[in-house]
């Protein structure tokens, strides 16, 4: 099942096996309204987990449920703690709405997302993604 118009970036395939696979970083879509904010289209997409959803496509044939976002992790990283707590203490990580790449390159041409923009992206993308996981 692909999401509604409001969640067309969210793909949920419901299987019948007790296995759930989530792909929070396979997306490369940047909403049109945000594209020009980034230094370059490539830089905003390069930290994706390229083709990971295809690598695990066989799991659907085994009955697995899969949840995938098509939104680039540079827009919002659905695998980050919204509180800012590091998932990997001592290692390079990015924020919920990253402002730089893992190589330390700035992602934005100008101002970075403020609290209101982060809250908007969280409500628009992060929360529906996690609600889809929780419903499984």
Describe every region a protein language model picked out.
Residues 1-136:
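N-terminal catalytic or cofactor-binding beta/alpha core of small enzyme domains
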């Amino acid at each position: 099942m692909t999401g509604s118009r409001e969640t067309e970036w969210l793909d949920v395939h419901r299987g019948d096996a007790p296995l759930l696979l989530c792909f929070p970083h396979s997306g490369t879509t940047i909403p049109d309204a945000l594209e020009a904010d980034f230094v370059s289209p490539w830089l905003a997409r390069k930290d994706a987990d390229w083709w990971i959803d295809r690598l695990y496509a066989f799991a659907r044939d085994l009955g697995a449920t899969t949840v995938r976002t098509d939104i680039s992790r540079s827009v919002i990283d659905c695998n980050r703690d919204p509180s800012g707590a590091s998932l990997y203490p001592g290692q390079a990580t990015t924020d919920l709405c990253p402002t730089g790449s893992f190589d330390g390159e700035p992602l934005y041409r100008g101002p970075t997302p403020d609290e209101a923009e982060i809250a908007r992206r969280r409500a628009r993308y992060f929360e529906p993604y996690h609600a889809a996981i929780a419903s499984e």
